[in-house]
Amino acid sequence: MLLGDILYHGPRNDLPDEYAPKQVLAMLNERRERLFCVRGNCDTEVDQMVLTFPILADYSIFLAGSRLIYATHGHVYNTAHLPPLCPGAILLRDILLHGHTHVPAWEPFGENNLYLNPGSVSIPKNGSAHGYMTLEDGVFEWKTLSGGVYHTLTL
């Protein structure tokens, strides 16, 4: 699951020296059958033209065990502005998964809900590592690019 801003991260951040969107799109296009993506605030129809998998969905909903995961970029829906999953609130025991802030997070909110953020592979913020998050068999792991695990959360 890619949480948006796939090829570009907007004008507020300097381009990293390693910025190579053509290499990123080639790598991702090769893996298109295994990717689910949501649109970030910097993703455009022009980006979609060069990618061979859909990236413009505003959100994705899927299950992890008994938990419903609402995955979105985070610039529209977040813990301050919850997504419209049920009248008045998100469902009991749901997970709100988003990027946007580039800061890893694993925080409870509401009644039995979780907010999770994988951080950022390309432009981490607040002193966090270049990293990502995996989900296997009900276990979330936050990892550095070298593969080291720095946080684990079991559902």
Label each residue range with its predicted role.
Residues L28, R32-F36, R67-N78, S128-M133:
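Short, surface-exposed, charge-dense and proline/glycine-enriched linear segments
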